[in-house]
Amino acid sequence: MKYRAYRNTDLRVSEVGLGLWTVSTGWWGDFSDEQAVALMQKAFDLGITLYDAADTYGNGRSEELISKAFRNLRDQIVVATKIGYDFVHHGNERRGQREIPQDFSPDA
């Protein structure tokens, strides 16, 4: 595995990351927590240190899986997470459907 330094830090991030959308949402088949954690731990064993998550991936499930898989390894992984789609108020709409209205103003 190749790694890169992350700007002005001591972090070494794998060039390949593992996105957790597919194991968190159930849109491409169901993954039990045990299956998802095993996959994530295998990726780590193969050198992957970057994991892509979001609060909307399975309504927070991706971040819960990270906790289960890497409870004692937190200082050895990098989590890229994000916010944006509001599934709480707009249901579990998928990309490709009509755009969900967003309001990123300070008053929102």
Predicted segments — roles?
Residues 1-81, 85-93:
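N-terminal binding-site loop/beta-alpha segment at the start of enzyme catalytic domains
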Residues 91-108:
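Glycine/proline-rich, positively charged
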